[in-house]
Amino acid sequence: MKIGFFSEAGYEGKVERNHPNMRTDVAWVCALDANHHPFPKLSTLSDDMYDVGVMILPKKRKPLLNYPLLEQYKRVCKKVTVMQESYYNYWQDSSIAEQIWYFNFLTEMDLIFCHNDVDLKYYNGITNVRTELLPTVMITDNIVPRNESGDGVIIGGNWVRDYGGFDSYQVALEITDDITSITTGR
């Protein structure tokens, strides 16, 4: 089965297991042995090039509103799927035009991949499209275990409502004052 993966990321091709920045989206491409293409390259790809496409739509979708993304995606892939981005109703913080565009895009999918059971029920209920879980993948081949111990806490996510950074910080304070917070996402 030939799988194409599509996102706003600027790289093309397969992802090797020794990739230096094996984020979840990159790990999915690697684990599925998929070829990745950025959105602007869709128009250059052959008809029915892939049996299945997996797409991650960006949080900021305004630039896509006037691009024939759905038409190009369906031309290139025999089956089209989308992976939800962020928490289940994040998209409802967008402009009305973006919300309608996003919802209409979802309803044209053969399958919607979700993060968890709650999101699965939500997306199936609101779109009546088949939903399945696509769990987080960690490829740990290049992770070197620490040989020293430490007492600090690392918290992830940004300090915005969407990621609960402040909540994580409060929990970490219960454990230690030595806290490291990395910036990710938006």
Language-model-detected regions and their locations in the chain:
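Conserved catalytic-core segment of nucleotide-activated headgroup transferases in glycan assembly
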Residues: E16-R17, N21, I139-R186
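Extended catalytic core of nucleotide-activated donor transferases of GT-like folds
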Residues: G4, E8, A31-N124
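Short loop/helix-cap segments at secondary-structure boundaries that form the rim of catalytic
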Residues: L45-D48, K121-I126, I143-E148, R186
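A short, charged/proline- and glycine-enriched loop
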Residues: M1-I3, E8-A9, Y50, V144-V153
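Short, charged N-terminal beta->alpha structural module
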Residues: M1-H37, F166-L173
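Short beta-strand/turn micro-motifs composed of small residues
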Residues: S7, Q84, C114-N116, P135, ...
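Donor nucleotide-sugar binding/catalytic pocket of nucleotide-sugar-dependent glycosyltransferases
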Residues: D110-Y122, N128-I143
